[in-house]
């Protein structure tokens, strides 16, 4: 709960379908000046879209609507690490939940950043994204993560 704030610290909640980018952008425009660079954060959500729902088009529409200097951040369940364990986890999640998960490979997640400039260290497992200490670097990750700038 925010007890007091300034316009710069304002927050909002938008309940929208990720595929409805027009609604998402309209909601964002009520709070943000979309003529200025912004951060588009698709953290642990794109794996909720099946391939036939065209997650690349969702990313492309969101990034087309924001100006140069904006950033895109993505984290996504990995399909190509610990493959047997991840496949089993995916089966269990998909049995337990009404929303199905689609895990994607490093190459597939990297493709979401096409046309943008990746920030170092690129698309890596979350535990490899600028770890603060050796313990963090040693913890195995199950998500690909990356950030990129729109030039």
Question: Could you tell me what each predicted segment is?
Answer:
Residues 1-151:
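Alpha-helical subdomain
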């Amino acid at each position: 709960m925010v007890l007091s704030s300034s316009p710069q610290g304002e927050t909002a909640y938008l309940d929208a379908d990720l595929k409805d980018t027009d609604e998402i952008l309209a909601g964002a425009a009520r709070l943000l000046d979309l003529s200025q660079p912004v951060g588009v954060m698709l953290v642990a959500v794109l794996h909720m879209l099946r391939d036939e729902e065209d997650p690349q088009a969702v990313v492309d529409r969101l990034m087309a609507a924001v100006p140069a200097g904006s950033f895109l951040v993505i984290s996504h369940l990995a399909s190509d690490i610990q493959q047997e364990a991840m496949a089993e986890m995916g089966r269990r999640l998909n049995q337990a939940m009404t929303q199905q998960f689609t895990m994607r490979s490093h190459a597939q997640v990297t493709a979401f950043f096409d046309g943008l400039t990746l920030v170092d260290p690129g698309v890596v497992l979350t535990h490899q994204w600028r770890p603060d200490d050796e313990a963090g670097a040693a913890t195995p990750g199950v998500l690909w993560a990356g950030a990129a700038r729109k030039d």
